[in-house]
């Protein structure tokens, strides 16, 4: 299938609107991607004509909704090449998925004196849950340091592992720098030391194929809203043997087998024992539509288009005076930058006046900001619906801001 950005853009209603009297150039998909009409329509259709509470319902609507929900679980398992759909837990997003692992697997397997390894480039969602776990049990949090070019100091990694290392929690792709970490060698090293590996895939799954079996990671988590799906839904993959051993971390309906005031409660089997309460069924349906949409386009086609666009953007940005870029030359999805000594908020505000949407701030990565000794950065993210013309508008906008502000 030939990739056509014009055809893709036609599927996204919001891209036809104007901001401040100018066509919207949406360069903030790494924060949250826009939704194609196919996703919007699928979720709306479910609420119009198919909504019902899932599980245990004897009536037709409930049975159909349950079947649709479980079909999306199967669809998502194929999307990341899991061995079984029952290795996938529906969560609210990447943050909840990581917290689930920290509170279920972590509480059961990490003890005083143990250690967990993360990196200096992690999103707060892959830092704070491990800090909280370590504080609870008296474990140590170890950190892989950064290089100035935005890659990790991988030569230090072997020195961080020891017989007390229980987990390596690492991002697949940095949400600020676009760095893609060499997961295969990192996972192999962790397993050689008897440690498990959790991968934060929030910034990876929309850019290229992910094969959890080939990676051999123990946990992989991602959100739907960055993958052109709805908010409030994500996927946590856990190797089956691990998932079966993990206790639930939330109690309520749907996750029990029996409840007795005198005998206590027994849990249903995984993955359903991790899905307490009424699920976000509409979001799950929308996620299924997003997976179908991206799969039909072909992730290899998307990756090729986006990489060409990234190379073009990096080359064009070289023409902007006093522009500092952060991250390696080879990157996925995002370009973080600052313009002279101007605060990122000021630059972002000017760009918004030009109809260009970028993200500004610390990007939930304060340790990374501290490493580069800046309070904030601007971040432009490139998605499959962005164009060379939008890149040109960004470059022209930055040049204009430089002339105005000096």
From Swiss-Prot:
One of its GO terms (biological process) is cysteine metabolic process. InterPro entries: Aminotrans_V_dom, Aminotrans_V_PyrdxlP_BS, Cys_dSase_SufS, PyrdxlP-dep_Trfase, PyrdxlP-dep_Trfase_major, PyrdxlP-dep_Trfase_small. It catalyses: (sulfur carrier)-H + L-cysteine = (sulfur carrier)-SH + L-alanine; L-selenocysteine + AH2 = hydrogenselenide + L-alanine + A + H(+). The modification N6-(pyridoxal phosphate)lysine is found at residue 226. Its EC number is 2.8.1.7, 4.4.1.16. Keywords: Cytoplasm, Lyase, Pyridoxal phosphate, Transferase. The keyword Transferase applies. The active site is at 364 (cysteine persulfide intermediate). GO terms for cellular component: cytoplasm. It holds the Pfam family Aminotran_5. It is found in: Cytoplasm. Its cofactor is pyridoxal 5'-phosphate. Pathway: Cofactor biosynthesis; iron-sulfur cluster biosynthesis. The keyword Cytoplasm applies. GO terms for molecular function: cysteine desulfurase activity; pyridoxal phosphate binding; selenocysteine lyase activity. It comes from the Bacteria. NCBIfam families: PRK09295.1, sufS. Cysteine desulfurases mobilize the sulfur from L-cysteine to yield L-alanine, an essential step in sulfur metabolism for biosynthesis of a variety of sulfur-containing biomolecules. Component of the suf operon, which is activated and required under specific conditions such as oxidative stress and iron limitation. Acts as a potent selenocysteine lyase in vitro, that mobilizes selenium from L-selenocysteine. Selenocysteine lyase activity is however unsure in vivo. Homodimer. Interacts with SufE and the SufBCD complex composed of SufB, SufC and SufD. The interaction with SufE is required to mediate the direct transfer of the sulfur atom from the S-sulfanylcysteine. Belongs to the class-V pyridoxal-phosphate-dependent aminotransferase family. Csd subfamily. PANTHER family: CYSTEINE DESULFURASE. This is Cysteine desulfurase. It comes from Escherichia coli O9:H4 (strain HS).
């Amino acid at each position: 299938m030939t990739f056509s950005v014009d055809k893709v853009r036609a599927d996204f209603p919001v891209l036809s609107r104007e901001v401040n009297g100018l066509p919207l150039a949406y360069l903030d998909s790494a924060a949250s991607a826009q939704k194609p009409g196919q996703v919007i329509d699928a979720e709306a259709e479910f609420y119009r004509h198919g909504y019902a509470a899932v599980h245990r319902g004897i009536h037709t609507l409930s049975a159909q909704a349950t079947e649709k929900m479980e079909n999306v679980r199967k669809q998502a398992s194929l999307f990341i090449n899991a061995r079984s759909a029952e290795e996938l837990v529906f969560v609210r997003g990447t943050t909840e998925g990581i917290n689930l692992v920290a509170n279920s697997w972590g509480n059961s397997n990490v003890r005083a004196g143990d250690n967990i390894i993360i990196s200096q480039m992690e999103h707060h969602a892959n830092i704070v849950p491990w800090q909280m776990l370590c504080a609870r049990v008296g474990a140590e949090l170890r950190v892989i340091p950064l290089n100035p070019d935005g890659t990790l100091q991988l030569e230090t990694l072997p020195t961080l592992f020891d017989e007390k290392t229980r987990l390596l929690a690492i991002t697949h792709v940095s949400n600020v720098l676009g760095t893609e970490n060499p997961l295969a060698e990192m996972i192999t090293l962790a397993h050689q030391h008897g440690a498990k590996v959790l991968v934060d895939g929030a910034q990876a799954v929309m850019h290229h194929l992910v094969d959890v079996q080939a990676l051999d990671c123990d946990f992989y988590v991602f959100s739907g809203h960055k993958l052109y799906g709805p908010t409030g839904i994500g996927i946590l993959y856990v190797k089956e043997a691990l998932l079966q051993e993990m206790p639930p971390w939330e109690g309520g309906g749907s996750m029990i087998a029996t409840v007795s005031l005198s005998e206590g409660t027994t849990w249903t089997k995984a993955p359903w024992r991790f899905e307490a309460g009424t699920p976000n069924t509409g979001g799950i349906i929308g996620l299924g539509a997003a997976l179908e949409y991206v799969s039909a386009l072909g992730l290899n086609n998307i990756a090729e288009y986006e990489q060409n666009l990234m190379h073009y953007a990096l080359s064009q940005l070289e023409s902007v005076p006093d522009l500092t870029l952060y991250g390696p030359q080879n990157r996925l999805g995002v370009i973080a930058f600052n313009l002279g000594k101007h605060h990122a908020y000021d630059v972002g505000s000017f760009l918004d006046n030009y109809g260009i949407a970028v993200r500004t701030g610390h990007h939930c990565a304060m340790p990374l900001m501290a490493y580069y000794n800046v309070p904030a950065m601007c971040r432009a993210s490139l998605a499959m619906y962005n164009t060379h013309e939008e890149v040109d508008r960004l470059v022209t906008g930055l040049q204009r801001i430089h002339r105005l502000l000096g």
